[in-house]
UniProtKB/Swiss-Prot annotation:
This is Probable S-adenosyl-L-methionine-binding protein PH1056. The keyword Transmembrane helix does not apply. Keywords: S-adenosyl-L-methionine. Signal peptide: none annotated. The keyword S-adenosyl-L-methionine applies. Residues 8-126 form the TsaA-like domain. It comes from Pyrococcus horikoshii (strain ATCC 700860 / DSM 12428 / JCM 9974 / NBRC 100139 / OT-3). Pfam families: TrmO_N. Transmembrane segments: none annotated. Belongs to the tRNA methyltransferase O family. PANTHER family: TRNA (ADENINE(37)-N6)-METHYLTRANSFERASE (PTHR12818:SF0).
Amino acid sequence: MKFEAFKIVPVGYIRKEKNVFIEILPEFREGMEGLREGDWIKLILWFHKSDTPELRRILKVHPHGNPENPLTGVFATRSPFRPNPYTVKVHKIEGNRIYIDWIDAEDGTPVSDIKIFPERYDCPKENYQSTSRLKS
């Protein structure tokens, strides 16, 4: 598999201190204008610690890392091992920082992009119940 390189510039980083939040870099803070407390957003992250040529070649995994689960294509899982290690999460905005309760990312994970999550297009399901038969 041959990869063509291109550059992605982080707009901020995940920070895990007393609270978990996204630290937006000063040169991108103007891009937060218009976001309000309580808005839902999508985050696009770069799993930088899963970014090696070997890990990018993994295209099938056992979901939840459990070998009892059948091998499944990474696009149908939440595995951090992907050809391009991105993930998307939904969070709320509170105050002048983007605070989040929890995220499946490490302190220092680069944030590549933030997009508004308009209810009419992408309404989150508050009471979602998984029908998955996979073992955790």
